A protein has these predicted regions:
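Ferredoxin-type iron-sulfur electron-transfer modules in oxidoreductases and energy-metabolism complexes
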Residues: 63-78, 121-297
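Iron-sulfur-associated redox domains of electron-transfer enzymes in respiratory
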Residues: 2-140, 164, 180, 184, ...
Length: 297
């Protein structure tokens, strides 16, 4: 029998037919392995036929969530779908919701979570491709391909710059999508009325954000959770581009202060709390909000 044993949701590994919940795991020292339940949201494209599958396995102190997923896929369930690449928090591809919070699976230690059941879900705000993997294209659609890179004319006129780090794409952003998932406006959990062009709220007789969101999704099935808001990651990228290229101010502010830009931010600050790289996108959004110019339509 393999170390990882799949069970039905809520069933005990020892007696899967009983239907009783897993017995509590006794506290152990950090040096000891523990047997935990990993509860994974499974679904097809678009989140179809969503369900939770439980896997019981022994977890070592050094095991990350990604390590455990790899073991489940290799030893127990090769159909499990998730995204991973670098395994050291550089690529951002393994971002997911772990016990209800956006985290990187590769650097989240299982035992450090302190729960006997670890629940894994895909990021919100982005279309689900299958199980824990989401489609990042709606986020990247609002980030121009050349933002954050040196353009040929700059290289020819300035040569190699001092401090190459400032030319790194989006600075410390690893484009993981955690901020998009955590943002209540983007993920659909904020039901405050949408902002008007002047930044004020709609009256009680106007549609709520939820109603407007549903209308947008009815007309475009590929639309993200809140089709009106481009989200914190694109706005953070836009603010970085503004700092690098002040000559493009009007062009960029037309996007940032336009109908899908900063006016939809409700300052929940969830995006900054979720960021694993300390980018603090909420500050970038507020920087754009304080600027003058750009689109007002």
């Amino acid at each position: 029998m393999s170390d990882a044993e799949k069970t039905a949701p809520g069933a005990s590994a020892a007696t899967p037919e009983s239907g009783s919940p897993p017995a509590p795991v006794a506290a152990s020292s950090p040096q000891q392995a523990r047997t935990l339940t990993v509860r994974v949201q499974r679904s097809g494209p678009g989140g179809a036929n969503a369900r939770f599958d439980d896997y019981r396995l022994s977890v070592r102190p050094e095991d990350s969530v990604l390590d455990v997923l790899d073991r489940i896929r290799v030893e127990t369930d090769p159909t499990l779908v998730y995204r991973h690449s670098c395994h050291h928090s550089s690529c951002g591809t393994c971002a997911m919701r772990i016990n209800g919070r956006e985290r990187l699976a590769c650097i989240t230690r299982m035992l450090a979570l302190g729960t006997d059941v670890v629940t894994l879900e895909p990021l919100r705000s982005l279309p689900v491709l299958g199980d824990l993997m989401v489609d990042m294209r709606p986020m990247f659609a609002h980030i121009e391909p050349d933002w954050g890179y040196v353009r040929p004319v700059e290289k020819a006129s300035t040569g190699v710059p001092h401090g190459v780090a400032r030319y790194t794409r989006l600075e410390n952003c690893i484009e993981c999508g955690a901020c998009m998932s955590a943002c209540p406006v983007s993920n659909g959990t904020d039901d405050m009325p949408p902002a008007t062009a002047q930044g004020s709220q709609h009256s009680a007789h106007q549609p709520t954000r939820q109603a407007a969101r549903q209308s947008a999704q009815d007309s475009d099935e590929s639309a993200p959770a809140d089709a009106m808001f481009i989200g914190p990651a694109p706005l953070a990228a836009l603010n970085r581009e503004l700092a690098r290229h002040p000559e493009r101010r009007e062009e960029l502010l037309h996007i940032g202060k336009g109908p899908h830009g900063e006016r939809h931010c409700r300052r929940h600050m969830a995006c900054s709390r979720a960021c694993p790289s300390g980018v603090y996108p909420a500050k970038d959004i507020m920087d754009i909000r304080m600027m003058h110019g750009g689109g007002k339509d």
